[in-house]
Amino acid sequence: MISQKGESYPASITSSLNNIFAHHGVLGGSVVTIDKNGYHSFYYGDAFPDSIPFTDSTFLRIASISKMFTGMALLQMVEEAKIDLDQDVNTYLNFTLVNPSYPNIPITLRMLLNHTSTLQDSRSILTMAKRTIFRDSLNPNHSIPDFSELFINGNSHFLPRTIKTEKGKISKVIPGSYFHYTNLNFVIIAHIIERIEQQPFHVVIKKRLLDRYAIPGGFIVQEIPEQGTLSPQYLLKGNTWIPEADAYTVPYDSIFTSIKDYVPGRNVLRFSPQAGLRVSSMGLARFFRSFLSDSKMSTIKTMMFKSSWKAKSDNNSHQFDNLFKEWGLACHIISEKQESFAEDFPWIGHIGRANGAFTMMYMSPSARKGIVIFINGKRKQSKGSIGFESIEKDIMNVIFNKHWRKE
C-alpha cells in the first residue's frame, strides 16, 4: 500500500534540498513528489519564525494554483450541462461585460479559463479585493461591497485595442486569441459558479472537489483541521519576517463571523477564488494524484488538458518572463523542453506567487508523476515578473535529474 504521508527522500537528495533552501534563505517550505513509487516529501524551516516547524500538517495559502480548482468546478458544471463554455458570458452575469474595442466578439467562459478574455487587473479590482478578502481583519466595520459595483464602468477592466510588442510591432488585442494572464478572469468564473449553484463558493469547492478525495483545507480558514497549522505568508523586511496574509492570533470564528451570513453572488472575492485555497503540500499532491487516477473525472481532464492557446510573437503580453507558451483550460501546459521539463510531455500545472509565498504544482498525466513546491518567505527577493524562480529551478534540477533519473 502506498503511504499517504510520504517517505523521506534518500539522504543525498535531502542534503541537496537542504542546501538549496538554506542558500536562498527560506523561512519555511516543502517539496512533495508523486510517481509510481508513491509519495516522497521534504520539509524545511518554520511555519512561524523560530517557533513551529514547517511539516506535513502545515497549511499555506497557495496563491494562483487555486485557479485550477475554480476551473475544475466550472468544468464539472459544463459536463452537467449547467453552463456552456462558448456562450456569451453575459448570459450568466448580473452586469454587462463587453470589450468596447470589439463589441461584436462575445466574451466566453472559455476565454476566461484560458486568459484570452482581454481583461486586466485594474486598480479598482485590487481596492475591492482588499476591502473584501481581508474585510474582517483589516476593515471590520465595513460592509462587503457588491461585486457588480466593480463593473459600473466596466470598460476600464479591458486592455487597450492594440499593444506594442517587445520588438516594436503593433499587436491587436482580440478576445479569444490574445493571452493576458489575469486574476479577474477567475473571480468572474467563481461569481458565475455561485449564481448558478446558489451556494457560497467555498462550499462548492469543498463538496465537488476536496471532499471527493478527503483532502483537508479550503477557501476559508475555518476549513483547516484542528491538528493543522496555518502558516502566514511572509516577506522579509530588513531582518524581520513580516506576515502579509493569514496572520491570526485569535480563533478564526471570532474574526470571520460574517461568513455565516454571506449570500451567494454578493461578492465572491470574499473567498479569493483566484488565490485563496489553503492546503498542505501533501494534501495538494494527494489531490492531484487522485484526480489523475479518477476515471469519473476523465471528461474534466480532457477539457482541461487540451491545448486552447499557443504563444506567437504577437498574441500575448509575454508575462512572467515568457514562461507561458501554451495554455489549456485553467492550467499551464508545458509540451516542449523548458528548464528541467525534458520528457514525459505534456506537463500540466500552475505557479503561484503572493505576499512572499512561491508555490508550484506540475504533473505528467502520461508518466503519472508530479511535483509540488511550497516556498514561504525567502531572503533573496526576485525583481520584476519572472517565470520560474531560481530556487524552483534548483529544486527541479535535483528532482528531475537526480531523484527521478534513478528510477
Regions found by a protein language model. Name each.
Residues 6-62, 163-171:
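Short, conserved catalytic-motif segment at the N-terminal edge
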Residues 8, 12, 16, 69, ...:
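Extracytoplasmic/secreted proteins, especially bacterial periplasmic and envelope-associated proteins
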Residues 24-30, 50-112, 170-185, 272-275, ...:
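Short active-site loop at a secondary-structure junction
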Residues 46-49, 295, 378-380:
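A short acidic/small-residue loop/turn micro-motif
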Residues 101-345:
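Short, surface-exposed loop or secondary-structure junction motifs
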Residues 293, 305-316, 336, 379-407:
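Short, gly/Ser/Thr-rich active-site loops of penicillin-recognizing serine hydrolases
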Residues 346-364:
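Low-complexity, glycine/alanine/valine/leucine- and proline-rich hydrophobic stretches
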Residues 358-364, 368-381:
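Short, well-ordered beta-strand elements
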